[in-house]
Amino acid sequence: MIKQRTLKNIIRATGVGLHSGEKVYLTLKPAPVNTGIVFCRADLDPVVQIPARAENVGDTTLSTTLVNGDVKVDTVEHLLSAMAGLGIDNAYVELSASEVPIMDGSAGPFVFLIQSAGLEEQDAPKKFIRILREVTVEEGGKRATFVPFEGFKVSFEIDFDHPVFRDRTQSASVDFSSTSFVKEVSRARTFGFMSDIEYLRKHNLALGGSVENAIVVDKDGVLNEDGLRYEDEFVKHKILDAIGDLYLLGNSLIGEFRGFKSGHALNNRLLRTLIEQKDAWEVVTFEDASTAPISYMRPVAAV
């Protein structure tokens, strides 16, 4: 049986919020079977919980924000991408502020944290959402699509009219049955344009952003001294974002996601459209792991 997974131990980290610039304390904790990923605002009394579900997404300006009434948690996508990539079904994410820390702008530090905590299999079958037919949403020349696929695959194309992008790969397709999320996707950092940063800061956004946690691009090129981690790091980060956004379905996917210039808003619209179309998907479990189209690495031992 492919079983659900949680963390073996509690683990903590500290960072800053990309948009708020505030110091944030993050604690990842094990959670019981069928809990899902639940964000907890531990700085509030009483603590407010927000399950990581598509219907709880509020704002999608520059990042994905979860809301419960007037309480929010910003920038959840990189941590959720790490949870998805390592197959974590159940966990509590405690935060001391309204934003997940940006760390280095990728999912890499979260992968390290989760691996350090260790993974534990639970005595319940892991649930997958299998895509049964194509579902597409489009808006303003952008497109996001689910298609049936026996495995999990993410294909993405970006289209930036800028010298830095023109010379680089702007499309990528990653089949996770043969490609490692940890090696090929998790370290891709978020990116931004120098020309946008002043505007964002005037609107109290990107206050914590720097070359320490993002690829910064100006008219001449990449400003980061160490350059890029992958030749196609820009489009790989869009794949990383999409994996995090897709995990708001609450289960791992069996299917392919195709994005063309898609972002957090359109990704969420695709999830909501899929959920409404009950004939487009089904929930499946696997009593025999050898019959599953997706193989997850064995639980990682605590370091």
Curated annotation (Swiss-Prot):
* Keyword list, A-Z: Hydrolase, Lipid A biosynthesis, Lipid biosynthesis, Lipid metabolism, Metal-binding, Zinc
Summarize where Zn(2+) binds, as residue positions. Answer: H78, H237, D241
The cross-references to InterPro entries, in alphabetical order and at most eight, read:
Ribosomal_Su5_D2-typ_SF (IPR020568), UDP-acyl_GlcNac_deAcase (IPR004463), UDP-acyl_GlcNac_deAcase_C (IPR011334), UDP-acyl_N-AcGlcN_deAcase_N (IPR015870)
Q: Which reaction does it catalyse?
A: a UDP-3-O-[(3R)-3-hydroxyacyl]-N-acetyl-alpha-D-glucosamine + H2O = a UDP-3-O-[(3R)-3-hydroxyacyl]-alpha-D-glucosamine + acetate
Report the SUPFAM superfamilies cross-referenced here.
Ribosomal protein S5 domain 2-like (SSF54211)
Record-annotated active site: H264 (proton donor)
Protein name per the record? UDP-3-O-acyl-N-acetylglucosamine deacetylase
This chain's source organism reads Pseudomonas savastanoi pv. phaseolicola (strain 1448A / Race 6) (Pseudomonas syringae pv. phaseolicola (strain 1448A / Race 6))
Species lineage, top-down? Bacteria, Pseudomonadati, Pseudomonadota, Gammaproteobacteria, Pseudomonadales
Give the gene name.
lpxC
